[in-house]
């Protein structure tokens, strides 16, 4: 019974992912790094104040250096308080000025 319930949960998750694939992977408003036509797309959910996100940042940078076929879609989720919201707003302003990547990299160092 547990196994069939787990299989149904996995199937439901796959259906939900398929239903939202465009919003996750192909939203033209989302900033991204890497190859715009990459054959592999990674979606990174982050908060610039998150220590785990900061620790993971060099790994993503290294992946992009090594594999020119990767596109990383960036989803800023400001969940760690008012300073996270302020940083998210700054990133939006930077995106409008074509400076998102530079600010993103600076905030996650």
Across the structure, where does each feature detected by a protein language model lie?
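Cysteine-centric redox/oxidoreductase cores and disulfide-bonded domains
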Residues: 1-7, 78-109
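Extracytoplasmic thiol/disulfide redox context detector
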Residues: 1-85
């Amino acid at each position: 019974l547990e196994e069939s319930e787990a299989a149904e949960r996995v199937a439901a998750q796959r259906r939900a992912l398929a239903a939202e694939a465009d919003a996750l992977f192909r939203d033209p408003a989302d900033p991204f790094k890497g190859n715009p036509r990459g054959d592999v797309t990674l979606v990174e959910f982050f908060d610039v104040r998150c220590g785990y996100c900061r620790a993971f940042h060099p790994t993503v940078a290294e992946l992009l250096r090594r594999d020119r076929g990767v596109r990383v879609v960036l989803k800023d989720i400001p969940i760690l308080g008012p300073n996270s919201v302020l940083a998210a707003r700054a990133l939006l302003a930077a995106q409008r000025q074509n400076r998102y990547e530079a600010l993103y990299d600076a905030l996650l160092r």
